[in-house]
């Protein structure tokens, strides 16, 4: 028996009782940073605002920040930003978001680039955007034939998410402009 055999396996019911910010990966709790850096939060807010402004006329989609996405009874993720469409009004997200944005920090980079990348791909999230605040750039991935296809690195360009219900877009120059020195 390995050490993992002795770790407790937690469920969504357990997760709901915990204080602080957590995610649940296949029954194992992952503590999230208690308070991200101001730059991280400001860029996340700017990304959410840009997405939200571009879908304002669409009544079927919403942009949310740090909302629980319950994938199963033992897996709950809390992406930085999601674009959801036709989601029932519930206490958590129940189906794959159209777009997920994760703003990288030193403590989450490996999880965001590996575990979450693979999970979002497997769960058929149409677009995954990984934002690098220190570099003021974002990588955009589009689901194609059940695999993520990198659309490019964006810093001063715009990207149209053509396969979303609300035809969302992000002007990365507008998002990053105020953070440039």
For the regions a language model picked out, list residue spans one by one.
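Gly/Pro/Ser/Thr-rich low-complexity, intrinsically disordered segments predominantly at protein N-termini
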Residues: 1-181
